Amino acid sequence: MSDQRVIRAAAVQIAPDFERPGGTLDRVCAAIDEAASKGVQLIVFPETFVPYYPYFSFVRPPVASGADHMRLYEQAVVVPGPVTHAVSERARRHAMVVVLGVNERDHGSLYNTQLVFDIDGCQVLKRRKITPTFHERMIWGQGDAAGLKVARTGIARVGALACWEHYNPLARYALMTQHEEIHCSQFPGSLVGPIFAEQIEVTIRHHALESGCFVVNSTGWLSDAQIESVTTDPKLQKALRGGCMTAIVSPEGQHLAEPLREGEGMVVADLDMALITKRKRMMDSVGHYARPELLSLAINDRPAMPVVPMSMSFERAGADVAPEIISGGQDECQHEPVAG
């Protein structure tokens, strides 16, 4: 019997609030409410949207970024905490899967973190960007493979990667082997210019084709006033314009709605889940089109820990702490990520 599910998804392209602490969270909640009025069941926000992506690190040297870096620490998200509680409540209220990018603060370090909340408000996945890109390495620490999981939500199997993680084919394959149905990708947007938008489009359409899944991609947006607040240099301001490609793509690599390349807005489309089988019938890259006896992937999915107590084996230590590290604590209700 064919898959009868049709899931309405939304990808959001809006600007953060640089001025008011908590302002970006208000924008997240308002967008969730708006999406609910459109019948949306899954919504994706841009990379590290709360409180904002560290654009300053792209156009300023580290020696001139200390105050802005400290401000980001002060507004960063503790998981679990007030931000996750607010988003959890909104997800539960509207029975919506919410995929949110945050700057996570874990004691003295910041991380580029993706959070997935299920339709009952439970946080079902917390993962950290494996390797921050270029300028980002001055801002965030590194994630590990413990978060390379697909979450089984109330509507579909959901996976997520951030920005140039999509250029790591092994990271993408790790999610593909768990049979993700909806891939949620996040990019900063308002960066590099039109060439970045073109690269994003190629990337997300290729992943949709290769994995045989839907891709819901969200990029951020900066207003002219916000760009001018980051840098007064006209040449550097050019580096903070363009680069937006908020879009929803089918398993056949087709846009399901007109993508958003500039300005604020929301791309909404219906995902006919039967298209997954239609694609994989022809090419299942982790099934009948795979050759695991020739090519296979090894993953060290143990959480990276600075201390392993001698009172327990390394394997035992990894098993004991993995759920907390993946989902970010016990305050939010949890579901088990998909194992395979």
Curated annotation (Swiss-Prot):
<dbReference type="GO" id="GO:0000257">
    <property type="term" value="F:nitrilase activity"/>
</dbReference>
<keyword id="KW-0378">Hydrolase</keyword>
<dbReference type="InterPro" id="IPR003010">
    <property type="entry name" value="C-N_Hydrolase"/>
</dbReference>
<feature type="active site" description="Nucleophile">
    <location>
        <position position="163"/>
    </location>
</feature>
<feature type="active site">
    <location>
        <position position="129"/>
    </location>
</feature>
<dbReference type="Pfam" id="PF00795">
    <property type="entry name" value="CN_hydrolase"/>
</dbReference>
<feature type="active site" description="Proton acceptor">
    <location>
        <position position="47"/>
    </location>
</feature>
<dbReference type="InterPro" id="IPR044149">
    <property type="entry name" value="Nitrilases_CHs"/>
</dbReference>
<dbReference type="InterPro" id="IPR023919">
    <property type="entry name" value="Nitrilase"/>
</dbReference>
<dbReference type="InterPro" id="IPR000132">
    <property type="entry name" value="Nitrilase/CN_hydratase_CS"/>
</dbReference>
<feature type="domain" description="CN hydrolase">
    <location>
        <begin position="7"/>
        <end position="273"/>
    </location>
</feature>
<comment type="subunit">
    <text>Forms oligomers.</text>
</comment>
<dbReference type="InterPro" id="IPR036526">
    <property type="entry name" value="C-N_Hydrolase_sf"/>
</dbReference>
<comment type="function">
    <text>Catalyzes the hydrolysis of a broad range of nitriles to yield their corresponding carboxylic acid and ammonia. In vitro, shows high activity toward benzylic/unsaturated nitriles. The preferred substrate is trans-cinnamonitrile, followed by mono/di-cyanopyridines and aromatic substituted nitriles, with a moderate activity toward 3-phenylpropionitrile. Shows weaker activity toward the common dinitrile fumaronitrile. Also shows weak activity toward some aliphatic nitriles, including adiponitrile and glutaronitrile, and the arylacetonitrile 2-thiopheneacetonitrile.</text>
</comment>
<protein>
    <recommendedName>
        <fullName>Nitrilase</fullName>
        <ecNumber>3.5.5.1</ecNumber>
    </recommendedName>
</protein>
<comment type="similarity">
    <text>Belongs to the carbon-nitrogen hydrolase superfamily. Nitrilase family.</text>
</comment>
